[in-house]
Amino acid sequence: MSKKKARWRKLDNAAKLYSAASNKKDTRVFRFYCELKEEVNPDVLQEALNQTIEIFPTFLMVLRKGLFWHYLEPCNLRPIVKEEYKEPCSRLYIKDKKTLLFEVTYYKKRINFEVFHVLTDGTGATEFLKELVKNYLYLIHKVNGLEPVSLLPEDMTVQDQEVDSFLKYYSKDQKRPKKRKLHAFQIRRKKKDGNHLHVHESVVSVQAVLKRSRELGVSMTVFLTALFMMAINEEMSKMQKKKPVVLMVPVNLRKFFLSSSMLNFFNWIEPGYNFTTQDQSFEAILKYTKEFFETELTKEKMSAHISELLALELHPILRLAPLELKNLCIQAGAKYSEKNTTAIFSNMSAVKMHASYVPYIERFGVYTNTPKFELCLCSFQDKLSFAFTSRYDTVNIERNFYRLLKEQGIASEKVKPEFPKTDEPSEQEMKVYKIYSFLCIAIVAAMLVTEYNFHPRIRWTLFTAGGVVTMWIASSIGFFKRYNLLKNAMWQLFVGTIICFIWDALTGWHSWSVDLVLPIMSVSTLTAMFVTAKVRKCPVREYLIYEIMAAGYGLILPGILLLCKVVKNPTVSMFGALICFLFLVAVILFKGREFKEEMQKNLHV
């Protein structure tokens, strides 16, 4: 395979949605794992990971924010293999914190690969894990005569991996008719520990499922989709059955369009069945599901859906909306669209390894963290691994599903959960912050009550209350932006100067906020950023945009205030603006290429 370093890139259509909609509970992280027939050696696994990342440099990315969109940027971070230490599919992307978007862990005989959906989809994750497992097994067993093999095309390049296939196959001419979506039945019964993700796995025979599917004249996915809808229906009340059971079924678009991309490239269909108005027999449900798949799974319909999604993203007005506004709209849209589906069924298909490596592997498995009840499956050899994930009480639905399988002559074997005792994320920092916020609120409230009742001649109560509010705002910015010191400094500059303007206005406007505070804070912040970047030896791409923002703020705002004659004593303000101007000139002269690249990244639409 041709090796070349990855470059910064725009997010694909699906990644733009995931970057906006992910949160602490809905992490949009999924786990693909391989269970071996022997205990994992962490040192060898680390060496195998180092080799794998050379093949897939597109994974060495961090998520950054631009003015209009997020983007992915190469970084110097390297993945470190760890023993499994937290709940499966926990958050990988933490706002403002520079972290990789994937993680490799191990536990006993299991190698786990977890990845944020912004980085890749199920197909990309499968290829990465296969390469990792292959490298690991070769390093362990080469002394026994195991030969190295290639799993990827020799002529595949990094450019192939980075192709945005959504854009490649987008066509303005493709349109699909609008369909009115009915609200689907929702699973709402929360577990007592509903904040935790519950994973229940079982294994069945691939051949048994295929045999029964062929007898019925349908594909494995159609067969299992019908059973899944029936299992959900059995737990619905008469009132609940007025709404249809609708499953979201992801579709790998590489089966319709030629693509070697490691980025997201999938679509979905939504088979739904109303058990009140339609025949409830298994034969009728299976017939409906088969016809639905045959109708929807066509290249033309997939292409039309791609065009529909891209048309919204590429709308000339919507593209120019600020990122934060886009995020709010995407989050609202994602929340609304949840009403249209009951659960998710994702078939990752068969994982294939070279014959010489098969004897060392027990099975592969996959599951994901979503706000919905989800069934994921993948197969290896004759083992079909099912994984139900949910934060709701779905035990009865799972029981129904396996009972229905048994009625079709397919036995299942439960997989005993093997997870270490996880380190719960520390809530101590947030607890301290909440106590601090409570004390600040208490002091401000006490000062206002004192002011109202005693009317002190020197209004020290209001000054105290204002000082506490100012201190709380500054420390809150420091707390929530603690992962990025340079962004923290920029926010402190922006909010700090606004607070000073307010204080100046409330005390009779003596112009000290614009004459002194604004230029001094701007130059001080710019200097602090420069020193911090040098001391921490940050790459240019990590600090340049913040220095440009600080210098621009220290030049443009004082300039406007000078022109509007708001500044009474212009000397300090003019010298501050001069320093910021010279800094920007120096950036253009000495860091012109980096400056241009940062502007492209942060202003791309």
Predicted segment positions?
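Non-catalytic, low-complexity flexible loops and terminal extensions
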Residues: S2-N13, F102, R110, L119-E127, ...
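Acyl-thioester-dependent acyl-group transfer interface
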Residues: M1-L67, L77-F102, E234-V415
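Hydrophobic alpha-helical transmembrane segments and adjacent interfacial helices
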Residues: L439-N453, T470-G478, L493-H510, L526-A533, ...
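Membrane-interface helix-boundary motifs at transmembrane edges
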Residues: P425-E427, S476-N488, V535-I545
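Central hydrophobic cores of alpha-helical transmembrane segments
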Residues: A226, A489-G496, L544-G554
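Generic detector of multi-pass transmembrane helix bundles and their immediately adjacent loops
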Residues: H510-V605
